Amino acid sequence: MKILAAIDSFKGSATSEQLNDAALSGILAAYPDLQVQSIPIADGGEGVLDVLAYQENAITKTSLTTDLLGRKLEVPYLLLGDTAVIESAKVIGIDLVDVSPETISRATTYGLGAVVQSAIQAGAKTIIVSLGGTGTSDGGQGFLKSLGTTDLSDVTLIGASDVTNPYYGENGAATIFAAQKGATADQIKQLNQRD
């Protein structure tokens, strides 16, 4: 019998690879003759780069940028041929802050722009930005501001997400996700007024 472990990460506690290894270790302890394989997976949040780094042509690059509170940091991204993959959680991730009403009011997507610019300079023609696991609710305003006049005419920019919520409203991004990022009910109402 063959067993495949492909478990997504548990936010803030264990990576996909760690969970796969734990599951397979338990299975092999009970059934040592089984054939097992581990394949890390991700849903668009934490771990996207770890999963794609297994690709033969994956090249890890780094970019100097700022996190969601404006603190300097260096983050990895991947080049797969002329496609770059950027994991938002590495730049503006919820795990980078202690969430509170104060952090949600200061948190910005600004730092993503520097990573996109770095990927363009590295030759990327397609840039995939995984959108999960963030600690921001600025609707991408900081990201757009940081790009400024960057020429994107020869670049395809793709947002990778496992949700389909609209920008704002009853089922909008702020209504559904801002509370987990520290927003109060009043802040969520204000975020929903950004149209």
Task: Name every feature range the model reports, one short phrase each.
Residues 1-131, 135-195:
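N-terminal loops that bind phosphate or other acidic moieties
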